[in-house]
Amino acid sequence: MMNEKILIVDDQYGIRILLNEVFNKEGYQTFQAANGLQALDIVTKERPDLVLLDMKIPGMDGIEILKRMKVIDENIRVIIMTAYGELDMIQESKELGALTHFAKPFDIDEIRDAVKKYLPLKSN
């Protein structure tokens, strides 16, 4: 049985590795993208169930990535991560369908709990 898929989108390698490890251990199948084009490619090919999306990414920003993801898969679940109180971006992303947001530096347990809430692992 295939595990639920999570895509981690962040230009910071350390954060991708950390989240990747945490959710792999939890039993999710994880994918990583460092930028918008990679992220959209993975969304198209792998159809992840949930995306952890950093809003501050060079090139295509988080809002643009979120908009394009929703075009590919309107039901995709997205949790956004922001570096600081970017209230406009948070508001806009929620209007675009983001489930919730976390400010960096985030508490890893809070993100883990949110992912489990929005994407419960199906028991085998």
Swiss-Prot record:
InterPro entries: Bact_response_regulator, CheY-like_superfamily, Sig_transdc_resp-reg_receiver
Cofactor dependence: Mg(2+)
Keywords on record: Cytoplasm, Kinase, Magnesium, Metal-binding, Phosphoprotein, Sporulation, Transferase, Two-component regulatory system
GO MF assignments: kinase activity; metal ion binding
Amino-acid positions noted as binding Mg(2+) in the UniProt annotation, renumbered to this chain: 10-11, 54, 56
4-aspartylphosphate found at: 54
GO biological processes: phosphorelay signal transduction system; sporulation resulting in formation of a cellular spore
Entry's cofactor comment: Binds 1 Mg(2+) ion per subunit.
The organism's place on the tree of life at top rank: Bacteria
Pfam families: Response_reg
Ranges where the Response regulatory domain occurs: 5-119
CDD domains: REC_Spo0F-like
This enzyme's EC code(s): 2.7.-.-
Localization of this protein: Cytoplasm
Main function: Key element in the phosphorelay regulating sporulation initiation. Phosphorylation of spo0B during sporulation initiation.
Protein name per its UniProtKB record: Sporulation initiation phosphotransferase F
